[in-house]
Amino acid sequence: MKSSRFLNESQTALVKQSWPMIVSNGFWTSFYTNLFKRSPSYQLQFDRFAHVPFEELESNVHFLAHSVRTGFVFNTAIELLETPDELHKILVDLGAKHRKFRLTAEHFEVVRDVLTRMIEDRLPTTGGPDRVALLAEAWKPFLTLVIGVIMDSATATVN
C-alpha cells in the first residue's frame, strides 16, 4: 500500500495540522454517541456497554475506555501517514480483531459518514471558507484510507 495514492504531501500536512483542533472537547465520546443515535443497534456490538442506558454512556468506564482506545488508534494512523507500510499493518491488524463481530461494509460506511460529518463540523474556520473546503477535501482520502483498510480486513474471509 502506498499512502500517496490516497493523500499527497499537502493533504497529509493539512490533516496533521488540523487534527489537534478537531479532536479536542471529547471528540471520541461524541463520536460514539452520534454513532449510536444514528444507528442504535450498533451499541449492542459492544458487550461491555451494550445495555447501558444511552444517557449513562458518558459516565460508563468501559465506554470511556473504548473511546480512548479508538482515539489512540486514530492518532497513530495520523502519525504514520508518512510510513504507509506501518500504517497498513496496524489497520489490517485492527480489522482482523474486528472479524469476530461479523461487521458488514454498511457498518463501516456508517462509521465513515459519522466521522466525516463530525470532522467537517469541527474544522477550524481560520483562513476563511476556501481553507475550510481545502481541509475538508484533505480529510476525505484519509478517512477512505483508514476505514477502507480496516473494513477490508474485518470483512475478509479467513481460510
Kindly give the residue locations of the regions a language model identified.
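Globin-like tetrapyrrole-binding proteins
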Residues: 1-159
